[in-house]
Amino acid sequence: MPNSYIFSSESVGEGHPDKVCDTISDAVLDACLTQDKYSRVACETLVKSNVVVVAGEITTKAKFDYNEVIRAAIRGIGYTNNDDVFHADKVFIMNILTRQSPDISQGVDAKAAEGKKKAEQGAGDQGLMFGYACNETEELMPAPIMFAHRLGRELTKIRKADKLAKWLRPDAKSQVSVRYVDGKPVEITNVVISTQHAYDVKHSTIEEFCINQVIKKCLPPKMLTKDTEFLINPTGRFVVGGPEGDSGLTGRKIIVDSYGGMGRHGGGAFSGKDPSKVDRSAAYMGRYVAKNVVAAGLADRCEVQFAYAIGYPDPVSVHVDTFGTNTVSEESIIAAVTKVFNFKPAEIVKQLNLLRPIFSKTTNYGHFGKIDDLNSITWEKTDKAAALKKAAK
């Protein structure tokens, strides 16, 4: 008997309250890095109704108008309609950002462990980070999360073009359920789209549009069957959305940001954090390693885990799991990984070229699986696959 199960993943649109916060936090980070690549940034955002609160710790030489950066980020999302309670030009902004604690910076900037070179950068915090890859899609990502991202991205593309569906508004969510047989995705069983809309559009119009212009356009036709269920705005109405409808916080969509629940997550959010924070940089490195392992044909699925201690430059552990899909021994894969890659925070930053204002490109539709801008999203490259394959022999 074949092993059959259904796995679901969701994505959210740029106007979702939590994504609004991620967008603002990464916009502030990029503004800092544009002028000072060594900026230390931990920017958290809260939104509700017409209020934006930014809090956290920033140490930078950059000089810019925080309010304008925040308003520009909101404007880019699309909260500019006259009837928006949360409006780019009208929100009240509270800024309670302070400098990074000297107790943290001394461990990040210099040695923390005996015998380590003074120039070595320590990890910005303790914690564990995961990277994951599989051969289910061209992007070497799990199918459910990639399909959900495709739907969300297409909704936003159509909304911002402002031609085909002028009634679309920024807040949206998508969810895709995929049936697996013997570990392989074979069909889509259910698709859910909830999209904010103008008050005067009929539900039937929204339903027809989402099915014909979004779902059938974005998802593989061979995986949509006569039994695939489409649920469009299941409550029947979604006029009040965004921060008017719900509060938002930076870092509350970490599963959307990563692997849709198929690969594990260490718990640390990405947005608003500079690359000295291993929550972000080591998670990117984990993806880089796992993707190259799969691209090298060493395994069909690969998950990598790192763990760090604050101020200490070396990871305290490195773990690789291929879930029995490996084509060579796991010992060979682990040996190859540790030979080809360096997991010290400073080396991660150098290898992935992270001291640049690239992070706003990561905020929406997943930090992983974006292969159309490898100059910025460097952890999606597969340039180490050949070296891994050679080292694993």
For each feature predicted by the language model, list its residue ranges.
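N-terminal, positively charged regions that mediate nucleic acid binding
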Residues: 1-42, 46, 380
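Glycine-rich, mobile lid/loop segments that gate access to catalytic sites or pores
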Residues: 8, 68, 75-239, 364, ...
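Conserved phosphate/anionic-ligand binding catalytic regions in large, soluble enzymes, centered on
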Residues: 10-12, 16-21, 121-137, 239-264, ...
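Alpha-helical support elements that line or immediately flank enzyme active sites
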Residues: 14-36, 136-153, 273-297
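A short glycine-rich, hydrophobically flanked beta-strand micro-motif that places a catalytic Asp/Glu
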Residues: 39-43, 172-178, 228-232, 298-309
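Short beta-strand elements
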Residues: 45, 108, 127-134, 174-197, ...
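Glycine-rich anion/phosphate-binding loop at the beta-strand->alpha-helix junction
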Residues: 158, 201-295
